[in-house]
UniProtKB/Swiss-Prot annotation:
GO terms for cellular component: cytoplasm; ribonucleoprotein complex; ribosome. InterPro entries: Ribosomal_bL33, Ribosomal_bL33_sf, Ribosomal_zn-bd. One of its GO terms (molecular function) is structural constituent of ribosome. Keywords: Ribonucleoprotein, Ribosomal protein. Belongs to the bacterial ribosomal protein bL33 family. GO terms for biological process: translation. Gene3D superfamilies: Ribosomal protein L33 (2.20.28.120). HAMAP family: Ribosomal_bL33. Pfam families: Ribosomal_L33 (PF00471). The keyword Protein biosynthesis does not apply. This is Large ribosomal subunit protein bL33A. The keyword Protein biosynthesis does not apply. Transmembrane segments: none annotated.
Amino acid sequence: MAREGFTLACKECKMENYISKKNKKKHVEKLEINKFCSKCNSKTMHREKK
């Protein structure tokens, strides 16, 4: 299957907050999104982690 699951981890505190899926064939690079981190209590950059 082309769709693969991964977690999004906060860049500042390294806490894994979100689970998502993406098409690995279309999007090869790692995903980076601004999301809310409950540990930091603010919006921070989250990066894809396996």
